[in-house]
């Protein structure tokens, strides 16, 4: 498997060269009124990039960072609990993503999109398998994020395909990429780092494919459909803020220390999403920011 460079920017910009090239080609396809071909490019890339959970170095490297020698048993367990909570949140997200990807596969009317979503369903199921194995290696699971469950429910119950694609792929999949990079940077030499590097690429493809397909959907979208997207964003953003700032009890102290940094990143994430919405032809002037972003 080709992995990305060790020192990456902590943002969502692609650094995996085949993905960068696919994005360039998809943008050119859109400019030449061949948006469906752009979606198909990400199907082809997803097939080439496909990996298996057995490819990871199970039993050869530690699952999570090890506490330094000489630390007390209490400190070791507290540190393991922190990593278990990190793994649990990603497992939860990918369990929900399996359901959402299945919906997209069933609802998409375009052949190219159905092909792509057939790979995305497999990706999300593979991610769940890997997180389940990693959680077991790390000693089990921790507390679920209630706000993430609520966000997933909103996306699953969204009435239009345009809303589902925008919320899951254009918005959420992009936001997780910087988090994977942060986790990987903090867990050198572990299975956790390896998995996060793999998922950075996979979710980058999911996001870019979503942008390409949303262009297809927006081509014939009515003003009413576009207005629904903005209204959905206004319902979603306050819950997204709660999710982004939430910490389980194992990491509550980190949340207090990192609150200013978290809010700054959150503001950047929301502004990024608004720029993305604008680039797809949505009138973002009615989006209500949950804070001074």
Write out the residue ranges for each language-model feature:
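A structural feature that tracks compact, well-ordered secondary-structure segments
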Residues: 98-104, 117-119, 177-183, 195-198, ...
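Short amphipathic alpha-helical segments with heptad-repeat character
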Residues: 88-91, 95, 118-121, 125, ...
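Active-site-proximal alpha-helical scaffolds that flank and shape metal-associated catalytic sites
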Residues: 131-207
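Terminal targeting/low-complexity segments that flank the catalytic cores of oxidoreductases
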Residues: 1-102, 106-114, 137, 141-144, ...
